[in-house]
């Protein structure tokens, strides 16, 4: 089977990570794959915030947990790093563009044997005063909206292989 198709079939959301950070070259390759995601009219309306700083990651996780309704929760599952995908809401297809970036990030991670998971609530995070403060710290205006948090790390989970697919999801006309 073609290697790209194999990765697409075998990629899983990972929720158990070892604590060590990713190798710089692996992280850079994942980021680059995200930057090459398709975008509407090639406007490239996204920004990737690579979070390697444990204190910043903890701030994001606390906000995410609060939005989820579990203030003491750990919705980042111990991942040592994350890439926050933001999109410029001045562009009409900002959400779609950011979603394509998220897919590329997760598929690139899988191709490198690195675990990843899309963690929701990024949009809500950057609507909160604390999230807006983070945007300001990063030099970004309030037009930047959260699309997703791609948590990353070397996995503690066994590789799972193919996943079953639901029937009746394709209609040829």
Please annotate each region the language model reported.
Residues 1-173:
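Acidic, surface-exposed loops and disordered segments
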